Curated annotation (Swiss-Prot):
Pfam family, one: HD
An annotated Gene Ontology molecular function: RNA binding
Record EC number: 3.1.-.-
Nuclease among keywords: yes
Name of this chain's protein: Ribonuclease Y
Role this protein plays: Endoribonuclease that initiates mRNA decay.
Lineage, highest ranks first: Bacteria, Bacillati, Bacillota, Bacilli, Lactobacillales
KH domain segment(s): 227-290
Region of interest (Disordered), residue spans: 114-144
């Protein structure tokens, strides 16, 4: 029983152990499955998180790459733009410097070529000068011998004509001289042209020597300021257009204006030289209008010169009116105002005559007021005292005589007429006002720096030079150029033939030598131009 009980107990224990083992095994298996499930879930979640993280990382990387590429492109574009701008600036600077260097090199080359050419010419002239002088001397002897032969022929013809025709000596001489002049006109003209051609090459050197000597002796600027006008050019290429083909433009300009055009190596500058201020002002206005317009040819030059002559005429009237109002004489005759306006372009010993007249008028008015005289009449007389100088180069007589005639013509008071007549002491002063004006004239002229004796003498010499040329038959007009070293004469082609041109130049030269005192040489140029104009309709 006890064994049975023990066996049962043992069996129960075994059963309990088996059941416990089974129970424990079941629990362990359940726990393991749960753990495995949790592990699978954890792994799945980890896999999901890793995938999401990888995707987010890929997105961030891609976005970062895009931003990096965009920034890189912007930086590259900015760098390229800056490089392009810098390269353009450098290229422009280099281009400007190259252009400037090219211009400088071109000028230097031209000057070197010109100097070489002048040096060659001077060398050639020096080598042939003695030979030409000897040739001229021989020809002069031949001409003398020929003249003797001609005189002998004339004597023979005189005797023959008197014997055959019973003519008087005077009649025979006239016939012979007429025949001789007609037969020898061509020969004389040819001889003169040959002689001029032989000494032409010497003239350039002599003119340069004279110019150098004058420059060394005189260093003042006054004459240049009084006789020169400067016109600025947009560029040096305009110099060639001003000269024109074969010099046509510059010759037309100089012949129409009577002003010398100086074109030298000075960059972008043309100088207009002439002693007549009105001509020089017309030339300056014409040149500036030609440069602005751009059309430079003889017809346009002629058109603008005529237009500017009319413009100057209007300015002259305005100057006269303004001066009359300034001195308190607004009731002056309009023609007298215009004549007085011309004095704006007239100088006396370097002093502007219109300003001098205004100055005399004001001084005379002040002195008349102090003395109890008619101040308005004194100003009027002082203003008109030099009116004759406005046209003394056009009308015969002194400026005093011309002024008296003008005052009488326009019915000025007798006091004014006597003041004009007596202000240089030519006649006796008949009023206190005449004495006052003479004193005011002396005060204005004696003011330090007011006048220059040399300029007046210079201008008078140029006027005399033109008067000599204009005195010959067939001469239309003449212009003194190159500071009086050249006289250019325009002749009527209907009265002066080609064969007579050289003879006219020779006669003018002889008369200048006999009547004028002048330094150096004077070139006489006679121009005969035949122009035909028609209109197509």
């Amino acid at each position: 029983m006890e064994i049975m009980s023990l066996a049962i107990a043992v069996f129960a224990v075994i059963i309990g152990l088996v059941i416990g083992y089974v129970s424990i095994s079941a629990k362990m298996k359940s726990s393991q499955e749960a753990a495995e499930l949790m592990l699978l879930n954890a792994e799945q979640e980890a896999t999901n998180l890793r995938g999401q993280a990888e995707r987010e990382a890929d997105l961030l990387v891609n976005e970062a790459k895009r931003e990096s590429k965009s920034l890189k492109k912007e930086a590259l574009l900015e760098a390229k733009e800056e490089a392009r701008k810098y390269r353009e600036e450098v290229d422009a600077e280099f281009k400007s410097e190259r252009q400037e260097l090219k211009q400088i090199e071109s000028r230097l080359t031209e000057r070197a070529t010109s100097l070489d050419r002048k040096d060659d010419n001077l060398t050639s002239k020096e080598q042939t000068l003695e030979q030409k002088e000897q040739s001229i001397s021989d020809r002069a002897k031949n001409l003398d011998a020929r003249e003797e032969q001609l005189e002998e022929v004339e004597r023979q013809k005189e005797a023959e004509l008197e014997r055959i025709g019973a003519l008087s000596q005077a009649e025979a001489r006239d016939i012979i001289l007429a025949q001789t002049e007609e037969n020898l006109t061509r020969e004389i003209a040819s001889r003169i042209r040959e002689a001029e051609q032989e000494v032409k090459e010497r003239s350039d050197k002599m003119a340069k020597d004279i110019l150098v000597q004058a420059m060394q002796r005189i260093a003042g600027e006054y004459v240049a300021e009084s006789t020169n006008s400067t016109v600025h050019l947009p560029d040096d290429t305009m110099k060639g257009r001003i000269i024109g083909r074969e010099g046509r433009n510059i010759r037309t300009f100089e012949s129409l204006t009577g002003v010398d055009v100086i074109i030298d190596d000075t960059p972008e500058v043309v100088t207009l030289s002439g002693f007549d201020p009105i001509r020089r002002e017309i030339a300056r206005m014409t040149m500036e209008m030609l440069l602005k317009d751009g059309r430079i040819h003889p017809a346009r030059i002629e058109e603008l010169v005529e237009k500017n002559r009319q413009e100057i005429d209007n300015k002259i009237r305005e100057y006269g009116e303004a001066a009359a109002y300034e001195i308190g004489a607004p009731n002056l005759h309009p023609d007298l105002m215009k004549i007085m306006g011309r004095l704006q372009f007239r100088t006396s010993y370097g002093q502007n005559v219109l300003r001098h007249s205004i100055e005399v008028a004001k001084l005379a008015g002040i002195m008349a007021s102090e003395l109890g005289e008619n101040a308005a009449l004194a100003r009027r007389a002082g203003f008109l005292h030099d009116i004759g100088k406005a046209i003394d180069h056009e009308v015969e007589g002194s400026h005093v005589e011309i002024g008296m005639e003008l005052a009488r013509k326009y019915k000025e008071p007798p006091v004014v007429v006597n003041t004009i007549a007596s202000h240089h002491g030519d006649v006796e002063a008949e009023s206190v006002i005449a004495v006052i004006v003479a004193a005011a004239d002396a005060l204005s002229a004696a003011r330090p720096g007011a006048r220059s004796e040399s300029l007046e003498s210079y201008i008078k010499r140029l006027h005399d030079l033109e008067e000599i040329a204009n005195g010959f038959e067939g001469v239309q007009t003449s212009f003194a150029l190159q500071a009086g070293r050249e006289i250019r004469i325009m002749v009527n082609p209907g009265k002066i033939k080609d064969d007579k041109v050289t003879i006219l130049a020779h006669k003018v030269r002889k008369k200048i030598e006999n009547n004028l005192d002048y330094p150096g040489n004077i070139k006489v140029t006679v121009i005969r131009e035949l122009r035909a104009v028609d209109y197509a309709k």
